[in-house]
């Protein structure tokens, strides 16, 4: 300002400058007013924006919280979805298994239907078989009743025939003992005659007696053998012929075809009684030595050995025939007398042969075993060219028969004892037809 007002006076301002200053002040005031108003507006906007920011922050916090909750929900939903998928997989596998079971059940159903049809056919067939079996059962019941009737009939017939056999056995025994008595009387008479002849003859006639007595010894042996063979050889065949002549043993109404039904009898009736020949042989073969009387307590059927010691009695087993035969235990006194006579005959024959043997060995000087005196040396006619009497030979043969087999009785007894040791059923099959 100093430059402009150099040629002016001091203290004085120009009007232009003043106007300009005024204009500048006005402009500045207007600017200040506009700026202040604008500043106020901006502050209001800032306050509004701060309020909006606060609201957005609150909304943001709420949104974040909501977002976190939604994320949790999403996680839970994901877990549920995974679980559902796993459950779906399990259910699908179960469904497949059920479908497989359903198919198998269908197959089993078809098989069961087929089996039911087969079983129905089998049931029908079994019903038919049951009806047939019932008919067969009824038929067999009828047969059983017929068999029972036949059994009772056969039992009665067996009892009757066994009674008839018992009667015939009693008759045959009586005949047999009468024959034994006759033979015993005849033998005693012959023995008395021989004793009388021996006593009447002198010692000078020994040579004649050597020829006569051995001729009588075979007769005695033959009589004893005939007496012993009669109960075994002639006793039972005669009974058989009598039974076979009658055919049905006094029952004409019985057919011969009924004999084939004997195998159908029960085992108790199948065992036939012991044959009569066995019973007679056991009664007649019992030997009693001389010089020893029977004790009163000893039964008549007890056997006595050759040494004089009583042996064990051989008893026949009990049988239905023996129980049915009345009076089977007959008196055995004639039989005991016959045995005593037989033993006496044997003793006399043995004494005679001992005497004859001593004389024979004195003449020929042939040794004899002293331990086996009963067995003579074998005959050999070329030793020393010494002739022998025919009567001596026959006496030796008769003596050997007496010592070896007792006239064949011991062999028969051994055969019968072997038969007794057999099974009674086998024995019955062999001898049942003989008894009938």
Curated annotation (Swiss-Prot):
GO terms for cellular component: membrane. Keywords: Acetylation, Coiled coil, Membrane, Phosphoprotein, Signal-anchor, Transmembrane, Transmembrane helix. Residues 193-207, 224-247, 344-362, 426-436 have a biased composition (Basic and acidic residues). Residues 1-14 are cytoplasmic. Residues 399-418 have a biased composition (Acidic residues). Residues 36-436 are lumenal. This is Protein GOLM2. It comes from Pongo abelii (Sumatran orangutan).
């Amino acid at each position: 300002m100093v430059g402009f007002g150099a040629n002016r006076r001091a203290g004085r301002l120009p009007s232009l400058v003043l106007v300009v200053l005024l204009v500048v002040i006005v402009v500045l005031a207007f600017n200040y007013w506009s700026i202040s108003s604008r500043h106020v507006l901006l502050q209001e906007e800032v306050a509004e924006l701060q309020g909006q920011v606060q609201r957005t922050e609150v909304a943001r916090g709420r949104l974040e919280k909501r977002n976190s909750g939604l994320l949790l929900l999403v996680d839970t939903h994901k877990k549920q979805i995974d679980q559902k998928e796993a459950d779906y997989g399990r259910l699908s596998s179960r469904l497949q298994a059920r479908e497989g079971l359903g198919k198998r059940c269908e197959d089993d159903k078809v098989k069961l239907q087929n089996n039911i049809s087969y079983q129905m056919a089998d049931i029908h067939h079994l019903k038919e078989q049951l009806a047939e079996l019932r008919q067969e059962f009824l038929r067999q019941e009828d047969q059983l009743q017929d068999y029972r009737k036949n059994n009772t009939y056969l039992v009665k017939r067996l009892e009757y025939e066994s009674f008839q056999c018992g009667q015939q056995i009693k008759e045959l025994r009586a005949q047999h003992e009468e024959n034994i008595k006759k033979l015993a009387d005849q033998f005693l008479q012959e023995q008395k005659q021989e004793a009388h002849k021996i006593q009447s003859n002198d010692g000078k006639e020994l040579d004649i007696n050597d020829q006569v007595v051995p001729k009588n010894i075979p007769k005695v042996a033959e009589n004893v053998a005939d007496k012993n063979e009669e109960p075994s050889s002639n006793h039972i065949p005669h009974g058989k012929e009598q039974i076979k002549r009658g055919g049905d043993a006094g029952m004409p109404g019985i057919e011969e075809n009924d004999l084939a039904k004997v195998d159908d009898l029960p085992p108790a009736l199948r065992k036939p009684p012991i044959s009569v020949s066995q019973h007679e042989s056991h009664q007649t073969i019992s030997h009693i030595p001389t010089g020893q009387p029977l004790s009163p307590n000893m039964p008549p059927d007890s056997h006595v050995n050759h040494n004089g010691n009583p042996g064990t009695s051989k008893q026949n087993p009990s049988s239905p025939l023996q129980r049915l035969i009345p009076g089977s235990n007959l008196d055995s006194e004639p039989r005991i007398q016959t045995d005593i006579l037989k033993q006496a005959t044997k003793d006399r024959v043995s004494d005679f042969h001992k005497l004859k043997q001593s004389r024979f060995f004195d003449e020929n000087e042939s040794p004899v075993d002293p331990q086996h005196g009963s067995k003579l040396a074998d005959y050999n006619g070329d030793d020393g060219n010494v002739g022998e009497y025919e009567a001596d030979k026959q006496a030796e043969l008769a003596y050997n028969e007496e010592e070896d087999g007792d006239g064949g009785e011991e062999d028969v007894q051994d055969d019968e004892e072997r038969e007794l040791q057999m099974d009674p059923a086998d024995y019955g099959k062999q001898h049942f037809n003989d008894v009938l």
